[in-house]
Amino acid sequence: NFQIRDEETFSLCIPTDRDYKILQLTDLHLGFGMFSGKKDKLALEAVTELIHRTEPDLMVLTGDSVFPFFPKSGTMNNRKQAEKLLAFLDGFQIPYTLVFGNHDCEMGSTCNKEQLAEIFTTGKYAVFTKGRYEHSPQNPITGVGNFVVDLTDDQGKLLLPLILLDSNMYGDGWFFSGFDRIHEDQTDWCMEKL
């Protein structure tokens, strides 16, 4: 029961007759490569157990879902990683959304963030859009995947807005520069949306 209202806002109808459960998953670092098979299997088993145990209404992946870093995963193909992750998540038939972390697109990976975002929009249960981003035709802001998921009741009344922001990658785009952050133009956009 979700629909996109505009390029940066989803509306997701939630049940009001019981508690609504959101499962947060972070830093899965799925590689789906020649060096990460055992680790990936353990991570997917743990996620499956969490989903069955908690029976969430929405899953929120908060960065570093995939890890296209050859020394750890044995591949730089984050396109394949994203497609496998979507197939896995869609199998549960539960809506999910996500934000990027610093490892989802490493230097030399197959897809940049905009390309990876296009893949994530194709998930059957994905509540995801590129939203307002660095190369938006109008009013660009830092990052990719800055958007809102408005949780509403069955009458369309807003119960809770979830603001999703790209925390970006590295300070100057390179691994050794240190982690980036949420930028002021992103927080300004948040204030506009609220």
Task: Locate predicted features.
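N-terminal active-site segment of His-dependent metallophosphoesterases
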Residues: 1-79, 84
